[in-house]
Amino acid sequence: LMKKRWAVLVASVIVNICIGTGFAWSVYQTGLFNEGAVIFGTEVQKSQLALAFTICSGVAPIPMIAGNGLQKKLKGPRNVVWLGGILFSAGLICTSFIHSLTMLYVTYGLLCGFGIAFAYGITIGNTVRFFPDKRGLIAGISTAAYGAGSIIFPPIMQSLIGSGGVMFTFRVLGILFGVMIIIAACFITEPPEGWLPTGWTPPAVKNSSGASAEGKNWKLMLADTRFYLMIIAFTIFATGGLMVVSQGSPMAQAIGGVDAAVAATAVSIIGLANTGGRVLWGWVSDKVGRYPALGIMAVIVAVSGFALSAFTESGSLALFLVFAMLIAMCYGGSMGVYPALTADAFGIKYNGVNYGIMFIGFALGGYIGP
């Protein structure tokens, strides 16, 4: 298992790169907006299109929580990841045939949203179970892969949109990602109950709240004041981060005065900061502690958010990128730290369900931010 866990991590990384393209929504949105009259039969507003991403993000806690129950019924994480991959792929392919905003909300918002969350929740929770000795770093790497999708694919997406249109792009990527996820999931297994890496002894757990030594289930977690402080902080990080990540393309065009191709590159640069932040802050949190790491990130987000709002009329793409990258880096950092933070605070045994509930904070950010 010591070697096998690395294969599981690599497979999970591939899955998360694929589903992470959902966060390059701003590239899709630009294509849909430009082709709106043909696709929808009328002009559409960017805010109407952005609602699809809001729904996609907002439904995430439901399948993340349900996925842990499905994992038992479907006999392992592999089948749940397959289910997520099929839903995500089907959502993209079905989006290529839509002719109304309502259908966009169903295909991209619900189908893709459920598919992404099923796969994401299982891959993150499962890899953290394989690496209790490196929770912060591994959670950071796993979630970084999710962010990497928004680095690798926007230029490819923009090229496909330029050559064949946005609907063609949905269709091609839907097929590609479906195949990649199904193959990668073949290598995903789960560790035995209570498994520990060879030679590693878990640190003593402070337990003064009446929870079992294995941790707190969701009911005990909801009775803990820390949960509410943690979820509020998660919402704040997600609000600022999703505002920049999901709307990077139109923001770059509006503030920097650049065309869609350059804006797609800006989205990739922001995605790089998002991805790098997940690994960086996951590693930092292992060294200095989860709460100090989050405190530093909070200060950076506050300063960068204020600066970004102050320079919106500057016309400088460089200034926009600097502050957008800082926000994205810390948003990504929170995504990398929170799976480990939740496991540290409430135990690893129930972390799948507990983190799914904690992810409601992210969903709220998805409603507020974009």
Describe each PLM feature range.
Residues 32, 117-131, 138-139, 333-346:
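Intracellular juxtamembrane helix-capping segments at the cytosolic ends
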Residues 72-84, 287-298:
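Cytoplasmic membrane-interface "Motif A"-like loop-to-helix N-cap segments
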Residues 145-193:
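Helix-loop-helix hairpin linking two adjacent transmembrane segments in secondary transporters
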Residues 25-32, 219-281, 369-370:
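Extracytoplasmic gate region of multi-pass secondary transporters
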Residues 63-76, 278-289:
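Helix-to-loop junctions at the C-terminal end of transmembrane segments
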Residues 86-99, 300-313:
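C-terminal ends and interior cores of transmembrane alpha-helices
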Residues 28-62, 261-266:
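Extracellular/periplasmic helix-loop-helix junction of adjacent transmembrane segments
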Residues 17, 91, 102-118, 235, ...:
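Hydrophobic core of transmembrane alpha-helices in multi-pass small-molecule transporters
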